[in-house]
């Protein structure tokens, strides 16, 4: 926006000064006084009271031009286009362009609307106020043009894992030039842009070099435009299609507890995922031929009635047009569980006592079974535990039997304790003393247990 005072008033003042200089002395004083009075009435640049504002509008929308007067004296207001053609003189429209419509006319404002703005309408528009001297102010209309077309192009519709591809995005015919941003999913990437100008319009092309991985399959690549004429997000996208070699995983589906023993059934399932999906999954035995009793059914490997000869490494292989992949499983067959005999009772009979000898059995069954990969160490530990338990049981039985024997002998000798005499002693001289001793012994018995004497 700018304002100016037309030079007609200054020219009049200058002409009056020249005339005063050429006049006679008496008249000269009067002319100078008149000149000073007239100069005080002439408006200067500081007294400019015509104003307007610049306008920015999006192509196809409506622009509003307003010529405003601060201190109106009912002077005429008119509006001119960039070619100095009169659009409105007061409330009259000489220009035959129906897109211009009068919104308001008064002594202090002339407001006009311009509909369906195009890039050709851009430029300076002039407001004029017919004062003495006339005043002029201009406004600039700037037209914003959003991108007419947004295109994204991928070098390859289908890429292979690890390959670098080129992605281009073009925003055509915008004003001013657009800013292009790249996203892969939610992650922003950096591209390289080139700007081409043609007839005050700009075409921007951005290039993105992208190395793809299998995780990028199905992820969108987004081209997003930022422009003052665009509200919200203007974007376009393409979904990546990435091919990758199979990923192989082996799962043991039987036995469920994870420990394989002789005589058990055994089953493995191979899972292979890739793009394109593997068409064939095969089983091989790495260190030997496949057992004859093994059954192969697609991704499943089944072996019935396991034995030690089945030990080895079994491999699942899968392939597609991208490549091959495999996974290994090491099988170790353990001995069958050891059967422990039930507890037994042994009875020994003597003359006066029955001795019962109990055999102590220690349970040697393992409380927890080892993992498949550590099964060999677990089996050796179980065998050692069985040997120690048997030895301990035998020692306990021997000690118990000896204790019982000592108790029996002690009780036997206690029952046969006493004084013994022979027949010869009975007829000897001291026999009377022996009888007396016996009588005294019988008469003086106070204990609960009877004391006896025997003569032989």
Curated annotation (Swiss-Prot):
Belongs to the nectin family. Homodimer (via Ig-like V-type domain). Interacts with FARP1. Interacts (via Ig-like V-type domain) with CRTAM (via Ig-like V-type domain); the interaction competes with CRTAM homodimerization and CADM1 homodimerization. Interacts (via C-terminus) with EPB41L3/DAL1. The interaction with EPB41L3/DAL1 may act to anchor CADM1 to the actin cytoskeleton. Interacts (via C-terminus) with MPP2 (via PDZ domain). Interacts (via C-terminus) with MPP3 (via PDZ domain); this interaction connects CADM1 with DLG1. Interacts (via C-terminus) with PALS2 (via PDZ domain). Residues 48-388 are extracellular. It comes from the Eukaryota. InterPro entries: CD80_C2-set, Ig-like_dom, Ig-like_dom_sf, Ig-like_fold, Ig_sub, Ig_sub2, Ig_V-set, Neurexin-like. Pfam families: C2-set_2, Ig_3, V-set. This is Cell adhesion molecule 1. The modification Phosphothreonine is found at residue 436. One of its GO terms (molecular function) is protein homodimerization activity. Coiled coil: none annotated. It comes from Mus musculus. Residues 1-47 form the signal peptide. The modification Phosphoserine is found at residue 448. The cytoplasmic domain appears to play a critical role in proapoptosis and tumor suppressor activity in NSCLC. CDD domains: Ig, IgI_2_Necl-2, IgV_1_Necl-2. Expressed dominantly in epithelial cells but not expressed in fibroblast cells (at protein level). Expressed in the T-cell area of lymph nodes, specifically in CD8+ and CD4- CD8- dendritic cells (at protein level). Expressed in CD8+ dendritic cells in the spleen (at protein level). Expressed in CD103+ dendritic cells in the small intestine lamina propria and mesenteric lymph nodes (at protein level). Expressed in brain, lung, kidney, testis, heart, spleen and liver, but not expressed in skeletal muscle. Disruption phenotype: Male mice are infertile, due to a defect at the spermatid stage of spermatogenesis, and show oligoasthenoteratozoospermia with almost no mature motile spermatozoa in the epididymis. Heterozygous males and females and homozygous null females are fertile and have no overt developmental defects. In the small intestine mucosa and under steady-state conditions, severe reduction in the number of intraepithelial CD4+ CD8+ T-cells and, partial reduction in the number of lamina propria and intraepithelial CD8+ and CD4+ T-cells. N-glycosylated. Glycosylation at Asn-70 and Asn-104 promotes adhesive binding and synapse induction.
């Amino acid at each position: 926006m700018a304002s100016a005072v037309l030079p007609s008033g200054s020219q009049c003042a200058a002409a009056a000064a020249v005339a005063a200089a050429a006049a006679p002395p008496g008249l000269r004083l009067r002319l100078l006084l008149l000149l000073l009075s007239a100069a005080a009435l002439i408006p200067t640049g500081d007294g400019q009271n015509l104003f307007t504002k610049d306008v920015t509008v999006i192509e196809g929308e409506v622009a509003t031009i307003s010529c405003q007067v601060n201190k109106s004296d009912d002077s005429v207001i008119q509006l001119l286009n960039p070619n100095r053609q009169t659009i409105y003189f007061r409330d009259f429209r000489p220009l035959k362009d129906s897109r211009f419509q009068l919104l308001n006319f008064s002594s202090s404002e002339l407001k006009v609307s311009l509909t369906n703005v195009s890039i050709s309408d851009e430029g300076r528009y002039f407001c004029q106020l017919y004062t003495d001297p006339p005043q002029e102010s201009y406004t600039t209309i700037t037209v914003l043009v959003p991108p007419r077309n947004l295109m994204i192009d991928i070098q390859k519709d289908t890429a292979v894992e690890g390959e670098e591809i080129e992605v281009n995005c073009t925003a055509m015919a915008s004003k001013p030039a657009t800013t292009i941003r790249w996203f892969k999913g939610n992650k922003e990437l950096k591209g390289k842009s080139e700007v081409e100008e043609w007839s005050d319009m700009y075409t921007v092309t951005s290039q993105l070099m992208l190395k793809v991985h299998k995780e990028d399959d199905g992820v969108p690549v987004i081209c997003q435009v930022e422009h003052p004429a665009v509200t919200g997000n203007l974007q376009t996208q393409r979904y990546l299609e990435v091919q990758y070699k199979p990923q192989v995983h082996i799962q043991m589906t039987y036995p469920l507890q994870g420990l394989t023993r002789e005589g058990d059934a055994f089953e493995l399932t191979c899972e292979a995922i890739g793009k394109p999906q593997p068409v064939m999954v095969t089983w091989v035995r790495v260190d030997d031929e496949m057992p004859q009793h093994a059954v192969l059914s697609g991704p499943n490997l089944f072996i019935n009635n396991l034995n030690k000869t089945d030990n080895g490494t079994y491999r699942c292989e899968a392939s597609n047009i991208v490549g091959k992949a495999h996974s290994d499983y090491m099988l170790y067959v353990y001995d069958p569980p050891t059967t422990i005999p039930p507890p037994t009772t042994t009875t020994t009979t003597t003359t006066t006592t029955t001795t019962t000898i109990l055999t102590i059995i220690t349970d040697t069954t393992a409380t927890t079974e080892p993992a498949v990969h550590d099964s060999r160490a677990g089996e050796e530990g179980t065998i050692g535990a069985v040997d120690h338990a048997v030895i301990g049981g035998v020692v306990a039985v021997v000690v118990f039997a000896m204790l019982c024997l000592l108790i029996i002998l002690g009780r036997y000798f206690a029952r046969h304790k006493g004084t013994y005499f022979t027949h010869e002693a009975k007829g000897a001289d001291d026999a009377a003393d022996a009888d007396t001793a016996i009588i005294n012994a019988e008469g003086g018995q106070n204990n609960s247990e009877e004391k006896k004497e025997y003569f032989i």
